[in-house]
Amino acid sequence: MAGVGDAAAPGEGGGGGVDGPQRDGRGEAEQPGGSGGQGPPPAPQLTETLGFYESDRRRERRRGRTELSLLRFLSAELTRGYFLEHNEAKYTERRERVYTCLRIPRELEKLMVFGIFLCLDAFLYVFTLLPLRVFLALFRLLTLPCYGLRDRRLLQPAQVCDILKGVILVICYFMMHYVDYSMMYHLIRGQSVIKLYIIYNMLEVADRLFSSFGQDILDALYWTATEPKERKRAHIGVIPHFFMAVLYVFLHAILIMVQATTLNVAFNSHNKSLLTIMMSNNFVEIKGSVFKKFEKNNLFQMSNSDIKERFTNYVLLLIVCLRNMEQFSWNPDHLWVLFPDVCMVIASEIAVDIVKHAFITKFNDITADVYSEYRASLAFDLVSSRQKNAYTDYSDSVARRMGFIPLPLAVLLIRVVTSSIKVQGILSYACVILFYFGLISLKVLNSIVLLGKSCQYVKEAKMEEKLSNPPATCTPGKPSSKSQNKCKPSQGLSTEENLSASITKQPIHQKENIIPLLVTSNSDQFLTTPDGDEKDITQDNSELKHRSSKKDLLEIDRFTICGNRID
């Protein structure tokens, strides 16, 4: 009977249809009775059915709800993982931005150092070579009757410009003697700190406006004085332009003197509050520049403006130190008192420029290699100004590119030096002569080093073709077609020979009815005056269309120095 019961139990458990599990439960309950009390009852067995797994899952779910705790949450947060390689391009771009920001200080300072030495070269030219060139031009003018009037021109155009610069420099220097520096110092010192801060900001804006318009006045004077006589008179005359240039240089020199006086008052203040406020003004410049959209040309213009501003600040600090040393009878101990303030002003200027350029390049996706292009463009100006037939003098080229006009600053520095240093006795005059020869040596050495570096930068940027491709000649009075205006490459000399052979040569005088071959230096072209081809294009197009923007760095000059937009 026990064997029959054991055989029937599986049949009862497995013979069911829909209610198989219920019948299986009954079979398990009937097994002890079916054994008839013979032997110990077998151990209960759990059959692997779907209902068992469902109940186990419900049991685990109920246990999971009851066991939710802060420890399990913290454990999940600490062990949760993620994979950055799913967004590899994004993180690679962010890493390159960090590397670009780290490269900005080095590349920017290399550009700044090169640009400052360019400004120094143009500034030393006024004190060293310009007086010698004026002397040679006057000597030619006085000795011209001895050689006869073989040429229709009494002087070369460059000599006329040199004489005009020298006369303007001398006249403005004597006019500056009527401005009392001591009275201006005490007048500014009696003002409140906030008023002086406002005055200093107004002076910075006025300096930019003067620099933007001043070179136009000087260029108009140079062109009016050297314009060929055959052309139709379309100007007011040389004398009015000359008086305008003298008035501009005099007013700009007074403006820079007020800036230097305000800075001197800040240095001599007891609590240094004014100096701190003036330094904080540099950090306000970050707010006005960082959050604007910048293109490469806009950044190039702003870099040139920063170079000019930094060099001007160095000269202002030199003037402040000279005035303070004069007041303390040239006591060298007082120089160490001024030294921390001078270093603080220079360090704040450098820090502001680095932060400003770093975030501008970050927000506008500009690489750090763009500063090498800017440096090559400045080097191109220097090399092209030393060519056999250059468009303009190098100092004027720097003025057009950066907005740095050396004449007003030179007038003020001469005025301060002559009033601060008294020359008495033969030994003092001998020291002055030796100092002048030292300036000439410094100018020559600086020019040689800059010229060598500039040729290197031009070759690295592969810009030699622009130096060796002069424009095609055309006779005046006849309109040239577009095909005739295309530049033809020069033959007979290689690029390296052109760079080495054409530098430091004097221009050859040609006939007036033939336009000479000039080096294509686009830096001296005015943005406001289109060429003949551009005039034809604008006449064919509608009047509502503006001229296309010039994207070549060599075509960007200082005409938009007061703003950030390049037309």
From Swiss-Prot:
Compositionally biased tracts (Low complexity): 1-10
Function: Plays a role in primary cilia formation. May act as a downstream effector of HOXC8 possibly by transducing or transmitting extracellular information required for axial skeletal patterning during development. May be involved in cartilage and bone development. May play a role in the differentiation of cranial neural crest cells. (Microbial infection) In case of infection, may act as a fusion receptor for cytomegalovirus (HCMV) strain AD169.
Protein name: Transmembrane anterior posterior transformation protein 1 homolog
Source species of the chain: Homo sapiens (Human)
Modification Phosphothreonine, positions: T529
N-acetylalanine carried by residues: A2
An annotated Gene Ontology molecular function: growth hormone-releasing hormone receptor activity
Compositional bias of kind Polar residues: 478-499
Region Disordered, residue ranges: 1-60, 466-499
Gene Ontology CC annotations of this record: centrosome; ciliary basal body; cytosol; endoplasmic reticulum membrane; membrane; nucleoplasm
Residue positions where Phosphoserine is found in the record: S523
